[in-house]
Structure formats: C-alpha cells, structure tokens
Amino acid sequence: RLPPQQIEKSPWSNKYDPPLEDGAMPSARGCWDSIHVVEVQEKSGSGTMNLGGSLTRQMEKDETVSDCSPHIANIGRLVEDMENKIRSTLNEIYFGK
C-alpha cells in the first residue's frame, strides 16, 4: 500500500489513482461539514470561569443545479445562511443575559 502522499483523487472522476478500495467518497447527495472554533484570551483582572458547550444545527434543502447556479454556489449559500442563523442565535444568547 502506498503512503497517502502518493495517492491522488481526481476532482472530475472522483476516483483514486492508484485505485484505493477503502478511500473516502462523498455522498451522492452532497453535504457540508463545518466546525467553527472560538478562541478566548484571558485578560488580567478577569475572574476564573469554565465554559463548555456544543451547538449542532442541521438543514436540508432541495436546490436546482444549472450553469448559472452550480452545486458549489448552492452549498455556499446554504453554509452562509446557516452561519448567519448561528451567529444570530449566539448574539441573542450573549446579549440576552
């Protein structure tokens, strides 16, 4: 078996070269997985606090694919819409307290 650096996957055919039996393949329906990381920097004079949490949102949407609205543009709009909703929710939680 070749090291990962010597295996390539074509963006056009979605096939590995050389062929790889257990290579990851995207869903036929298409999906987007995103993780947002927030860094908090401690300031002097601040109290001590432990904060943790998890936020999961899921959206499903049917879109048409055409030359003027390709698949990647539809995914981009979906990601931006979801990001705006999450930012709004966090803003309401933060300023609502």
From Swiss-Prot:
GO molecular function, one term: actin binding
Region (Disordered): 1-27, 43-66
Cellular component terms (Gene Ontology): F-actin capping protein complex; sarcomere
Keyword terms: Acetylation, Actin capping, Actin-binding, Cytoplasm, Cytoskeleton
Major subcellular location class: cytoplasm
A biological process from GO: regulation of cell morphogenesis
Compartments (UniProt record): Cytoplasm, Cytoskeleton; Cytoplasm, Myofibril, Sarcomere
Biased composition (Polar residues): 43-57
InterPro entries: CapZ_alpha/beta (IPR037282), CapZ_alpha/beta_2 (IPR042276), CAPZB (IPR001698)
Any Pfam family: F_actin_cap_B
Cysteine pairs bridged by disulfides in the record: none
N6-acetyllysine PTM sites in chain numbering: 97
Function: F-actin-capping proteins bind in a Ca(2+)-independent manner to the fast growing ends of actin filaments (barbed end) thereby blocking the exchange of subunits at these ends. Unlike other capping proteins (such as gelsolin and severin), these proteins do not sever actin filaments. Plays a role in the regulation of cell morphology and cytoskeletal organization. Forms, with CAPZB, the barbed end of the fast growing ends of actin filaments in the dynactin complex and stabilizes dynactin structure.
Quaternary state and interactors: Component of the F-actin capping complex, composed of a heterodimer of an alpha and a beta subunit. Subunit of dynactin, a multiprotein complex part of a tripartite complex with dynein and a adapter, such as BICDL1, BICD2 or HOOK3. The dynactin complex is built around ACTR1A/ACTB filament and consists of an actin-related filament composed of a shoulder domain, a pointed end and a barbed end. Its length is defined by its flexible shoulder domain. The soulder is composed of 2 DCTN1 subunits, 4 DCTN2 and 2 DCTN3.
Family of the protein in this entry: Belongs to the F-actin-capping protein beta subunit family.
PANTHER family noted in UniProt: F-ACTIN-CAPPING PROTEIN SUBUNIT BETA (PTHR10619), F-ACTIN-CAPPING PROTEIN SUBUNIT BETA ISOFORMS 1 AND 2 (PTHR10619:SF0)
Protein name stated in the entry: F-actin-capping protein subunit beta
